[in-house]
Design a protein with these regions (language model features):
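Active-site loop-to-helix "anion-binding N-cap" substructures in soluble metabolic enzymes
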Residues: 1-151
Length: 151
């Protein structure tokens, strides 16, 4: 079965304003190369441009929305913005384990408006973490890292 896929993501920390160097069109281009199929990158996150593009999709089409963090409501978990994100799609699949803990409109707010599920990557991460906590193989070494390891 082929689906119509609307992808959303963020890049960097533009703090609710458009930063030209953080647009997702290059990400869409790279994704199209990796998938060997077209990916339509939109210059908007919500609104008529998005609604029209989604309405015109056929099974197998992929759309990538613009950087979610360009919208001030994303990191504030704004309910109106979350509802706008949900308006043009039928369901939500969360497949970004690294940001699943964040209470943002696209990770937390949207689930109030749509049937939601975890994606395969998140499922694998959760299973691996569960295995590491419940029955780790010994000897064991834990490596922690990241830009905000103190968090």
């Amino acid at each position: 079965m082929r689906f119509r896929s609307v992808l959303c993501s963020h890049l960097g920390r533009p703090n609710g304003v458009v930063v030209e160097g953080l647009r997702l069109a290059p990400v869409g281009d790279r994704l199209a190369t990796l998938l060997e199929c077209p990916v339509k990158s939109l210059p908007e996150i919500t609104g008529p441009v998005v609604a029209d593009a989604v309405s015109a999709m056929v099974p197998g089409d992929i759309i990538l929305l613009e950087n979610l963090r360009f919208h001030p409501g994303e990191e504030e978990n704004d309910g109106v913005f979350a509802c706008e994100l949900a308006d043009t799609v039928d369901c939500f699949v969360m497949d970004a384990f690294a940001v699943a803990h964040r209470a943002h409109a696209s990770t937390n707010g949207i689930i109030r408006f749509l049937p939601s599920a975890m994606g395969l990557l998140v499922q694998r991460e959760v299973e691996a973490m569960g295995q590491a906590l419940e029955s780790p193989e010994r000897p064991l070494a834990a490596l922690l890292g990241g830009a905000k390891v103190s968090d």
